């Protein structure tokens, strides 16, 4: 079908394909209390392909295992090559820190400053590499939990740099630090300000907080 965008007398039609599910939603089983999850920070786990340590054209160039805030070179291939080891631990599922693109200047090794929700970070591998990892894990009776972050994104994300309006992000897209005091949300004695700063404040100055009410 066509998506029609209008700006005054200007019109733009964009063809959009709504693809059918490969599997029915009710056939997909999530993790439960029966599972034992093994949390992996991909950049810190194992370097299976040193050639992708510095992604082509990406902002951060530093790879240094002696620097706690730099990239260390771990990737999807490194995880894939250690699946037998992980399975032997007796776990039933792998929980990966976000693997989507984090094209930030520095300090995004953790994966929580996503700049493209549709692309696996090139320093980890490709979208196809990720799918292959999941298939290989399933062959070893391991589930894979994909960590999705929709509370905030990286400031280099196109959704922030080319936002439709400043209301797309909390505090009109201006940096206001969260208090991290989430208990105030349920505290009957907390002020409206305390609750707002806890839920709407930014995680860091380079992780703008999405306005979920928009």
Feature annotation, model-predicted:
Residues 45-214:
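Substrate-binding/active-site clefts of carbohydrate-active enzymes
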Residues 15-20, 40, 187-191:
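A short linear-motif detector with a strong N-terminal bias
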Residues 26-54:
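Compositionally biased low-complexity segments at domain edges in trafficked proteins
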Residues 1-30:
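Extended acidic/polar, glycine-enriched regions
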């Amino acid at each position: 079908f066509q998506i029609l965008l209008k700006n005054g007398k200007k019109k733009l039609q964009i063809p959009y394909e709504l693809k059918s599910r490969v599997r029915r939603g009710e056939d997909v089983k999530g993790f439960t209390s029966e599972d034992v999850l093994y949390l992996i920070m991909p950049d810190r786990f194992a370097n299976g392909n040193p050639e992708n340590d510095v992604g082509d054209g990406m902002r951060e160039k530093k790879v240094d295992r002696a620097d706690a805030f730099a990239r260390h070179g771990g990737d999807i291939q490194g995880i894939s090559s250690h699946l037998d080891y992980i399975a032997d631990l007796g776990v039933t599922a792998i929980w990966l820190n976000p693997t989507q693109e984090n094209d930030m200047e520095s300090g995004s090794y953790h994966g929580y400053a996503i700049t493209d929700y549709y692309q696996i970070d090139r320093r980890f591998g490709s979208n196809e590499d990720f799918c292959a990892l999941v298939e290989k894990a399933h062959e070893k009776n391991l589930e894979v939990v994909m960590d999705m972050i929709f509370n905030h994104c990286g400031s280099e994300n196109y959704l922030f740099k080319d936002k439709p309006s400043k209301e797309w992000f909390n505090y009109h897209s201006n940096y206001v630090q969260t208090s991290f005091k989430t208990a105030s949300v349920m505290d009957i004695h907390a002020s409206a300000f305390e609750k707002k700063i806890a839920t709407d404040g930014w995680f860091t100055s380079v992780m703008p907080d999405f306005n979920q009410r928009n």
